[in-house]
């Protein structure tokens, strides 16, 4: 059952258990109804709401069984979107529950696979990261196992370790961007900076820009002044264009 924060049932969802199950999507769920608006619902919120507020932490996982696995492993702030991507309305809901009033007094942790789809999902979150006044992190399992599979194969400690190994979202995005280039070559470093520059120019909170510049210079291994010049050049080039265009990962199929 999919419940709201008041524990009223809004719909139902399930996960495909076996690869040969006759279901085209990994997750299936109730279509939208007048009372079930997927962009306003987070699975597991009835269990996690109080702890999200108490701990100023929210762990965003992919699906229903990941929420179950996280809670069984002691991660009692885990929730998931239902049949849709995590969006702006979900972010505002989390922010309200955490009680943020503009200071960095909490953390939102997204779990992603380490594959290309996971990287695209991280980029999509980065684009909307300024919605959160909390600090945003990414927890990635290199083997590609989700929390449910981790629990079944390695036990609850592995799920807790996944969350504990979280890294800042901006670092994950920048490292994945520059990893496509040969940083042992001068032209490779310049190309990496130019590829990552739109990430910096997309930041709406200008008080964060200097820290991002320094982080990028450390990741690439070059002088921060060079990074600053390239970012300024990119900003001038794209001043009249959208700040950052990212192709989002495919939306989960709805049942």
How would you describe each model-predicted region?
Residues 1-104, 122:
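Phosphate-handling DNA/RNA-contact segment within nucleic-acid enzymes
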Residues 5, 49-57, 72, 87-255:
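A charged alpha-helical hairpin associated with nucleic-acid processing machineries
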